[in-house]
Amino acid sequence: LLITVATVCIYTAILVGWHLYVPRENLTIQVPGADNRPEGLARKANDVVIGEYFMKYEEEPPSGLTGEWTGFRGERFDNVVETPDKINTEAGDYPVVWSFETGEGHAAPVIYKGRVYVLDYNESLNSDALRCFSLESGKELWRRWYRVPMKRNHGFSRTVPVIRDEYVITIGPQGHVMCCDPVTGDLKWGIDMQKQFKTEVPFW
């Protein structure tokens, strides 16, 4: 009988303790940095790796076309192109030689040494993409891109690359600067202006 009473008391104490136990009192709220992991080891979901991806599409010999448009509003920033080629200004209609689809936005291309460059935005991949085309055929030669999720704000891409012999430089809508080789598409460097310089992205 004594053993039975003792057993009942033990089980009763366990049952009461189980009901009174509050597990939340022993939980620690996990916050970033609580594990003392050095910064930069773990990639966050919103991290942008500028120029992370690359695709080469076509090989094409240099074009004989000499027209150039090297940046915003042209070489002299006056919206004037100088060319020895004669343009028939009296033509009623100009045939479309080639075209390509882009994402929504207000970006414009640059033209240099027979190639066309434009900073596009791919909504399906959430990516800024520097695309290089042949001026003569319209074939895409290469593309370098990086993931940067954005919300539509009067479209997406809205800037114009700038180009010289050794560099083509872009700046994305979120302040990501990317410098590539104009011929090969190789990444030279990238800067996240928000992270490095604490800049603010304007509404427009």
Language model: regions and residue ranges:
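Blade/loop signatures of beta-propeller domains
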Residues: 39-95
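Residue position within the beta-strands of beta-propeller blades
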Residues: 116-118, 170
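Short glycine/acidic-enriched loop and turn motifs that connect beta-strands
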Residues: 76-79, 123-126, 176
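Short coil/turn segments that connect the beta-strands within blades of beta-propeller domains
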Residues: 113-114, 165-166
